[in-house]
């Protein structure tokens, strides 16, 4: 049994694994002959989670089932069940195709790239990142607004493949099975329904440049990037088995879809329905290729993205869940940060709802939650390293609204008091 037997601390108990005393940890669990602290229990749980994740990835010839993929996505992404279902099936089929070969009895299995349509901050990027972790393949992101056709100033589309190769630590075979997420593809729509007379190198031109690498080609990739080193040896990367996921907010697409669904007749046969009361997410779910064409994507580009998953706006309830429920939830991250100072960070329910309401007002979705949290916790994070005796900090609705300072609870008095300088 881990006990000290000298001086005043003869009755002090210690963790049998890390050696910390009962005063240095929050909980110390006693067994028949040993003790284990809460920190070691958490470490054990992390190890078990990693083992479970490895087991998932190795199931069924290395291809997890759609249900398994969906379950892991649920751990990290709140809501968006329809999108997660579509993605789970698409990713499962893609890597099953690679595991069993693309050709069998003269039947060639074509690649199905994915288009994610949804407002800013609804989880598009997080979904793509989590999928790459589940399958355990290299992953890279690119911003479509920074791309241009080869030969023009800005970034060549081939640099996307270079980034993927770097993510794979220059292992070409691994890179050729990776996932590429291209964000803001709605920003490279052409400026009108008719083909432009002048060269559109950052809109339609980028769509044209992306076509070949998305469908499958052998790309010549400069290891040092760009074309400034003409003597360098180019790497040949086959993009046929790289899964491309494109995402964008597509602001205004819902209006195009709704307009298509409206009747144009007059008289007795007229469509007399009132304004569409459905949510934006429900309308987007009815998207058709013709709607994307009207929005400004070229037919060939639409054809390279046969799987379309639509995401909905996040409401206040969903944002509160995003703050608290996922394994890497923001509240958990900041609580861990404060634990490093031996301080417990607590949020009231109305504080969480107010934070979520602020994010909705800013129209930033889940992406805006971190900046709000940083603003709220700036003073405590500044003061805490120089203070002693603080046991916990409470954030309530008034703190989020800027009408009060966070409440500090001191260990010796166990009474609430405002932050220093309040």
UniProtKB/Swiss-Prot annotation:
Span of the secretion signal? none
Which sites bind Zn(2+)? 15, 18, 37, 40
ClpX-type ZB domain span:
3-56
Q: Which residues bind ATP?
A: 119-126
Pfam families from the UniProt entry: AAA_2, ClpB_D2-small, zf-C4_ClpX
Instruction: Provide this UniProt record's keywords sorted from A to Z.
Output: ATP-binding, Chaperone, Metal-binding, Nucleotide-binding, Zinc
CC per GO annotation: HslUV protease complex
Molecular function GO labels: ATP binding; ATP hydrolysis activity; ATP-dependent protein folding chaperone; protein dimerization activity; unfolded protein binding; zinc ion binding
Subunit comment for this entry?
Component of the ClpX-ClpP complex. Forms a hexameric ring that, in the presence of ATP, binds to fourteen ClpP subunits assembled into a disk-like structure with a central cavity, resembling the structure of eukaryotic proteasomes.
Describe the family membership recorded for this protein in Swiss-Prot or TrEMBL: Belongs to the ClpX chaperone family.
In Swiss-Prot or TrEMBL terms, this protein is called ATP-dependent Clp protease ATP-binding subunit ClpX
Q: What is the lineage of its organism?
A: Bacteria, Pseudomonadati, Pseudomonadota, Alphaproteobacteria, Rhodospirillales
The gene from which this protein is expressed is: clpX
């Amino acid at each position: 049994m881990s006990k000290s037997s000298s001086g005043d601390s003869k009755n002090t108990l210690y963790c049998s694994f890390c050696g910390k005393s009962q005063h240095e940890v929050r909980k110390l669990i006693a067994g028949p002959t040993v003790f284990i602290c809460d920190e070691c229990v958490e470490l054990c749980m992390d190890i078990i989670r990693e083992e479970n994740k490895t087991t998932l990835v190795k199931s069924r010839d290395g291809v997890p089932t759609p249900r398994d993929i969906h379950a892991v996505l649920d751990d990290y992404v709140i809501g968006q069940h329809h999108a997660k279902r579509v993605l789970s099936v698409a990713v499962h089929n893609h890597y099953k195709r690679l595991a069993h070969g693309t050709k069998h009895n003269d039947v060639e299995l074509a690649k199905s790239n994915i288009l994610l349509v949804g407002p800013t901050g609804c989880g598009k990027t997080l979904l793509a990142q989590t999928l790459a972790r589940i399958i355990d393949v290299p992953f890279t992101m690119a911003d479509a607004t920074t791309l241009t056709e080869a030969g023009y100033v800005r970034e060549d589309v081939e640099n996307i493949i270079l980034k993927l190769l770097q993510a794979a630590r220059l292992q070409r075979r691994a890179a050729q099975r990776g996932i590429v997420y291209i964000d803001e593809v709605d920003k490279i729509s052409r400026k009108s329904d008719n083909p432009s007379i002048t060269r559109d190198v950052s809109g339609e031109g980028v769509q044209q440049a992306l076509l070949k690498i998305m469908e499958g080609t052998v790309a010549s990739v400069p290891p040092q990037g760009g074309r400034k080193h003409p003597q360098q040896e180019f790497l040949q990367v086959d993009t046929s088995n790289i899964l491309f996921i494109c995402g964008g907010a597509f602001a205004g697409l819902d209006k195009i879809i709704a307009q298509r669904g409206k009747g144009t007749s007059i008289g007795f046969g007229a469509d007399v329905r009132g304004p569409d009361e459905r949510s934006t997410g429900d309308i987007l779910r009815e998207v058709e290729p013709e709607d994307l064409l009207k929005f400004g994507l070229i037919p060939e580009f639409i054809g390279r993205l046969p799987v379309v998953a639509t995401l909905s706006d996040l409401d206040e309830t969903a944002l509160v869940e995003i703050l608290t429920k996922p394994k890497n939830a923001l509240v958990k991250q900041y609580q861990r940060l404060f634990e490093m100072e031996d301080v417990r960070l607590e949020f009231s329910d109305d504080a969480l709802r107010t934070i979520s309401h602020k994010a909705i007002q800013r129209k930033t979705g889940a992406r805006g939650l971190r900046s709000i949290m940083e603003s709220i916790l700036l003073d405590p994070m500044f003061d805490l390293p120089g203070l002693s005796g603080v046991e916990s900090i409470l954030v309530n609705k008034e703190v989020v609204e800027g009408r009060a300072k966070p409440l500090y609870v001191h260990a010796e008095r166990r009474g609430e008091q405002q932050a220093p300088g309040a």
